[in-house]
A protein has these predicted regions:
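Conserved catalytic or regulatory cores that recognize and/or transform ribose-phosphate-containing ligands
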Residues: 1-206
Length: 206
């Protein structure tokens, strides 16, 4: 039986990472990797779209907006496709009171308040919602940037998140040293996925 995205031949891939320290990686994916993947998908009558929510906003601006709700909505709309990029930063941890103050606490995500009370970052909330807690199959992959000896990971929550991601066997996890290596890994992963979901010898008319 075909999934809804196989019937519609439409794939949306959500890219998750912290705001500030993954600009080079996101640029590599958006400007180099995804154009090539889109062409491969197009040749199979598939529309492939990456969801990159940077939009040029800073973390400070995000704290006073509905960016949390937008992220969760986009993850839901992109499910089951998800890319997680993890570096050294754990990311912005908004308080429940801050979101309520700015009227950015979405009612349809009732579980969000508990995650905020636990002090979760938006990045971990994205990962938990999009992948780790998903009861349905996911087409996810995670890419963990190797830390050089001079860089100290000071937040134990980030180390724990990386360990949690690594220990889950529902998806592939890769280590990378450079944006270029990341690009090669993502391109290979999603070429394989396209071959699996939309075999080249079974192209359907639009």
């Amino acid at each position: 039986m075909k999934n809804k995205f196989q019937k519609s031949r439409n794939i949306r891939i959500f890219i998750s990472s912290t705001f500030q320290d993954m600009q080079s990686e996101r640029d590599m994916l958006v400007t180099k990797v995804f154009p090539r993947l889109r062409q491969i998908a197009y040749e199979r009558n598939v529309t492939l779209t990456e969801v990159d929510l940077r939009w040029g906003i800073t973390e400070e601006e995000a704290k006073s907006s509905k960016v949390v709700e937008i992220c969760l909505d986009e993850i839901r709309n992109s499910h089951p496709f998800f890319i997680g990029l993890l570096g050294e930063r754990y990311g912005w941890c908004p308080s429940k009171e801050t979101l309520i103050e700015h009227q950015a606490m979405p009612d349809r995500y009732e579980w969000l308040a508990a995650d905020l009370d636990r002090g979760m970052s938006i990045t971990e909330i994205e990962i938990q919602y999009g992948v780790l807690r998903s009861l349905e199959p996911v087409y996810a992959s995670f890419y963990i940037r190797k830390t050089d000896e001079k860089t100290i990971e000071t937040d134990p929550r980030q180390a724990q998140l990386k360990e949690t991601v690594r220990n889950n066997k529902r998806y592939n996890t890769y280590d990378y040293c450079s944006p270029e290596q990341l690009g090669e890994q993502v391109e290979s992963e999603f070429k394989t996925l396209l071959d699996h979901l939309f075999p080249k010898n079974k192209v359907e008319d639009p």
